[in-house]
Amino acid sequence: MNLNSIPAFQDNYIWVLTNDEGRCVIVDPGEAAPVLKAIAEHKWMPEAIFLTHHHHDHVGGVKELLQHFPQMTVYGPAETQDKGATHLVGDGDTIRVLGEKFTLFATPGHTLGHVCYFSRPYLFCGDTLFSGGCGRLFEGTPSQMYQSLMKINSLPDDTLICCAHEYTLANIKFALSILPHDSFINEYYRKVKELRVKKQMTLPVILKNERKINLFLRTEDIDLINEINKETILQQPEARFAWLRSKKDTF
């Protein structure tokens, strides 16, 4: 299996997973034009689309792609049924695409019906987890998003986080505003800044490394707890997550 990315809009990535025969699955195609261009250039044969949630920048290209490739199966949660999904999927479902088994996780928070697709090592997590951050809570609660992130955090160390936006630099700047002396975050900031100066992507990221630099995965970390305690005493990791998310919303 080979992982490919197609830039879209201002900061989206449309992921394309291909096998040795050139058959492919397209993840969250927010627009069709760059996908069609890549398909023509690489002579890919689209077999399926994975949708993580219903937002337009993740589903906007589905109907046009289906006009070109009507044989494709479009998998998505119930909230994408009117966005082009042909096969509805949910928590605990397994599907076989490109000869590989993918497991579905419900990850509510960003939207109520958000799902992730996992076939080791690839995790297509849409707008749930970003490098250094997590999605805004447009529909779900902090508790829901926290539990969703803990599902992801329980995956194997070598999991490749294939999220949908290039938000890494801004997220790491936020992390440094909370833990300015953290050695892992500072090292990652230098690396990410260098990549972005060269207009190179920072994704995908390995979960093992993400646990070190993403504050939203470190709500039981003593350094973070001590920093939060300077402002407010929060006993539960879910409450610390909510505090962080609130801070990020206004950063």
UniProtKB/Swiss-Prot annotation:
Q: What is its EC number?
A: 3.1.2.6
Q: Name one GO molecular function term.
A: hydroxyacylglutathione hydrolase activity
Give the reaction(s) catalysed: an S-(2-hydroxyacyl)glutathione + H2O = a 2-hydroxy carboxylate + glutathione + H(+)
Q: Which UniProt keywords apply?
A: Hydrolase, Metal-binding, Zinc
Question: Which one Pfam family would you cite for this protein?
Answer: Lactamase_B
Query: Looking at its record, which EC class is this enzyme?
Result: hydrolase
Please list the residues that bind a divalent metal cation 1. 53, 55, 110, 127
Note accompanying the cofactor annotation:
Binds 2 metal ions per subunit; upon overexpression in E.coli the enzyme purifies with various amounts of iron, zinc and manganese. The endogenous metal is unknown.
Identify the residues that bind a divalent metal cation 2: 57-58, 127, 165
Q: How does it assemble?
A: Monomer.
What's this chain's function?
A: Thiolesterase that catalyzes the hydrolysis of S-D-lactoyl-glutathione to form glutathione and D-lactic acid.
Stated name of the protein? Hydroxyacylglutathione hydrolase
Question: Which species expresses this protein natively?
Answer: Salmonella typhimurium (strain LT2 / SGSC1412 / ATCC 700720)
Gene giving rise to this polypeptide: gloB
